[in-house]
UniProtKB/Swiss-Prot annotation:
<keyword id="KW-0963">Cytoplasm</keyword>
<keyword id="KW-0378">Hydrolase</keyword>
<dbReference type="GO" id="GO:0106435">
    <property type="term" value="F:carboxylesterase activity"/>
</dbReference>
<protein>
    <recommendedName>
        <fullName>Esterase 52 kDa subunit</fullName>
        <ecNumber>3.1.1.1</ecNumber>
    </recommendedName>
</protein>
<comment type="similarity">
    <text>Belongs to the type-B carboxylesterase/lipase family.</text>
</comment>
<keyword id="KW-0719">Serine esterase</keyword>
<dbReference type="GO" id="GO:0005737">
    <property type="term" value="C:cytoplasm"/>
</dbReference>
Length: 10
């Protein structure tokens, strides 16, 4: 999954 703004990746 892409790393979103915030720095988490589910």
């Amino acid at each position: 999954a892409p790393i979103v703004s915030g720095g988490y990746d589910f």
